[in-house]
């Protein structure tokens, strides 16, 4: 699958919605897991500001990659962010978009990061 690395070095990023489990199947409520590690996947909505534009991105992150208290407005660093184009067909309708995944989302707020 194609992956496009996203450079976050010139961006300001902060939490828009705290982490929550990523749902794999809405019909059954099944929670998504990382294919390699089996870790629960989490979704963190972030405000991504760069080049005078602001976007809200939903970023999938393995649960161990979430560090620090991530509440609304918390500035964060995103490690290993990639964009993945996707397309599917459901009930005869074609849909497409871009999904985002990261290795880690780390709080930059003083005193909130967990000790390693």
Positions of predicted regions on the chain:
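OB-fold and OB-like single-stranded nucleic-acid-recognition modules
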Residues: 1-116
């Amino acid at each position: 699958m194609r992956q496009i690395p996203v450079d976050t070095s010139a961006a300001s990023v902060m939490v828009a919605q705290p982490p929550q489990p990523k749902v794999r199947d809405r019909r059954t409520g099944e929670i998504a897991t990382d294919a390699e590690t089996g870790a629960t996947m989490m979704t963190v909505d972030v405000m991504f500001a760069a080049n005078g534009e602001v976007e809200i991105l939903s970023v999938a992150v393995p649960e161990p990659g979430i560090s620090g208290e991530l509440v609304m407005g918390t500035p964060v660093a995103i490690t290993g962010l990639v964009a993945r184009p996707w397309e599917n067909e459901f009930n005869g309708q074609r849909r497409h978009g871009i999904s985002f995944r990261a290795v880690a989302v780390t709080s930059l707020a003083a005193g909130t990061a967990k000790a390693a």
